[in-house]
């Protein structure tokens, strides 16, 4: 530990001005430790005297907020350094992609240090297997910042100053040095350096692969050798002994990546792709890998070289969700009561209306790839066989199934679809290609499917899919006297007294995304909305703000201080949350339907 005091450096790294009740200090690590010892036995609020910036030599430690009492959320702390002081390789800061991957790796390294050292008084955001932009760690060309929390020890409300001194004299510096030290000439540091460079290489390869999708007009690519199966339904760890993916020869393509070099794998072209196969043979596993391919994955995950268009949207039924002013007329018409389905609203959507709304909302937001699994879909929205068409005449059936619109969806609107169908062959007529999963082996059975179509023809319709009519313009909402913004897990949000369930938005993969979405919803509806800007305009404004200010932009929406547990969500997922929010109101909203079919 350094014993030097460098006030100018500490002030430069702090990024914050002085605040109030207790003066913010600029002092050495030794001064901090002495102060904590002196606080032993005092009442808990005296801990606030250590708020400030402290120089630990190779890094500065900023104690930004002290918890109100021993049972409150823990105190907020930042470790701040520079890439040069840390000895980071130049490759780690050479580009925005490299810096993003570096930040992700450093956060994982800090988590690992806390676990291995069993430092339970120090907490930090625990990342998922996806490489995301997270507020817990940021890397810039001249600054590295790590945000975490420390539970300040006490007996009752009496400060345990000697224990606190130990935490800041040993535990915090040890964990930070484990994370920040790339200068030491020891095997452990060399392994970390190699791991960091590997992490960056995998992320840069993934970003290149996503650009290749755009350049070549593909919607997804799965490299040969990828491990798609997961250990269990509640684990994202790869299944041990799983059969590596191998592309059908007819769909195999070659890509060249900057680090991995030449890879071969399955390239999925635009249009309608149907995945078939027996139960438990890997259909949903393949679709699951494709839907998570909108994110980069860490080395060793097995899906490092699986990439999907980043605006791809998994669409499913969600009984009971709210729908506000959505044009579902391509799928739902002449409802009982003559409700206007060009501007459909309900507080309690059925399976079919909820999925129809999700389809249309995704299209309106510019998604060019829809992902659908029959297991989580409304059957009456997906198919309607000949017998049912004969029994229930068209004029008595308000639902037009997706199978009648899916070809037009691509030809007229440029929206591709990948769907899993194991129980109905109705989509074979519409498919541009048919994949079969057989004991986790992927086969191209498009030719055989065409033979089946000829042998067993079905009467079907190819109806035109029109672009949604409604221009949706959110009205500004007004907050309660005691505003509340809360998120929990992957799917639960509360804004004031309104609860929001995002369980059907399957591509939210990190609790930090859910928390970020909660604050972004408050910003969109309580700050940005003005009754004249469309939903897409509001989202574009939000994206510009995030690009220029980062995740800290949510502070202007009411988030406290320097948030350390946020992960950046995709804009389409923010929009999906907004579309499900029961408080959403549209400007000049027309009378709505509350019908549930």
Please state what every model-predicted region is.
Residues 1-217, 228, 578, 587-597:
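N-terminal accessory targeting/assembly segments
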Residues 160, 321, 331-352, 384-399:
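Flexible beta-alpha connector loops of hexameric P-loop NTPases
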Residues 229-264, 309-312, 316-323, 329-331, ...:
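N-terminal pre-Walker A segment at the start of P-loop NTPase domains
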Residues 263-292:
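Glycine-rich phosphate-binding P-loop
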Residues 350-362:
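Conserved alpha-helical scaffold flanking the Walker A/P-loop in AAA+ ATPase domains
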Residues 362-406, 410-411, 420-429, 433-450:
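Conserved P-loop NTPase nucleotide-binding/switch module
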Residues 411-414, 420-597:
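Conserved NTP phosphate-binding and transfer environment spanning the P-loop NTPase/kinase superfamily
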